């Protein structure tokens, strides 16, 4: 099972990738996490990425693809992988296809989580976390049991990410649509794109993803 999960910020890609990882024993690969791990480990690619980031520039596709190549060689990818939110552009998609072919990986399916933009703004702008233990909450969908008190540790201190503000979220969605929209026909022409309603309940979204994978002929890996 080698798949890509696409969708705008707040569509639930990370949540669904984690569910599929736990259920089928495949590796969830989020490029941001991978990049931070490489930088922290001080690998050759990590050092190159750190130098680029410290200069204020964007890490090149070549570096990201190189990191992905290394990541896919690790044992937890033996049953397959889920790429969470990558690629974002057609050049990235083309470079990814080339690298996967070189490494003898077949890309089975690309799942697009489609969510209404007004819902996305509400989902993202309502998020907050406990400043003490990091537990995540939402004003509407997952409030604390007792207002102002963390369910897990009892702290009264909470934080919100600056880029979760409604106006910032709207700007991120504009950027996503401008940058990522062209890769949808790229994968559709290859017969790999499958659209799933990301506005349903979490379990229903998972079921729809699994249904799309079955229709695509993707066999679930055997789990120990």
UniProtKB/Swiss-Prot annotation:
Region (NMP) residue spans: 30-59
Residues the record lists as binding ATP: 10-15, 127, 200
Protein name (Swiss-Prot/TrEMBL): Adenylate kinase
Pathway listed: Purine metabolism; AMP biosynthesis via salvage pathway; AMP from ADP: step 1/1
Source species of the chain: Acidiphilium cryptum (strain JF-5)
Compartment(s) where it occurs, according to its Swiss-Prot or TrEMBL record: Cytoplasm
Family: Belongs to the adenylate kinase family.
Subunit structure: Monomer.
Cysteine pairs bridged by disulfides in the record: none
Leading EC class: transferase
GO CC entries: cytoplasm
Positions with a binding annotation for AMP: 31, 36, 57-59, 85-88, 92, 161, 172
């Amino acid at each position: 099972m080698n798949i890509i999960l696409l969708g705008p910020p707040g569509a639930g890609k990370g949540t669904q990738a984690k569910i599929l990882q736990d259920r089928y024993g495949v590796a969830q690969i989020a490029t941001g996490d991978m990049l931070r791990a490489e930088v922290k480990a001080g690998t050759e690619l990590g050092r190159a990425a750190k130098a680029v980031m410290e200069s204020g520039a964007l890490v090149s596709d070549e570096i990201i693809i190189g990191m992905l190549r290394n990541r896919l060689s690790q044992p937890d990818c033996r049953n397959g992988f889920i790429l969470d939110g990558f690629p974002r552009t057609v050049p990235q998609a083309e470079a990814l296809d080339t690298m996967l072919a070189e490494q003898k990986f077949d890309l089975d399916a690309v799942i697009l989580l489609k969510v209404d933009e007004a819902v996305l703004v509400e989902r993202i702008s309502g998020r907050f976390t406990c400043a003490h233990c990091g537990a995540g909450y939402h004003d509407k969908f997952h409030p604390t049991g007792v207002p102002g008190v963390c369910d897990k540790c009892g702290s009264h201190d909470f934080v919100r990410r600056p880029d979760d503000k409604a106006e910032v979220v709207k700007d991120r969605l504009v950027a996503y649509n401008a940058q990522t929209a062209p890769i949808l026909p790229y994968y559709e022409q290859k017969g790999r794109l499958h659209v799933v309603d990301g506005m349903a309940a979490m379990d229903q979204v998972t079921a729809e993803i699994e249904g799309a994978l079955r229709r695509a002929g993707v066999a679930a890996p055997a789990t120990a």
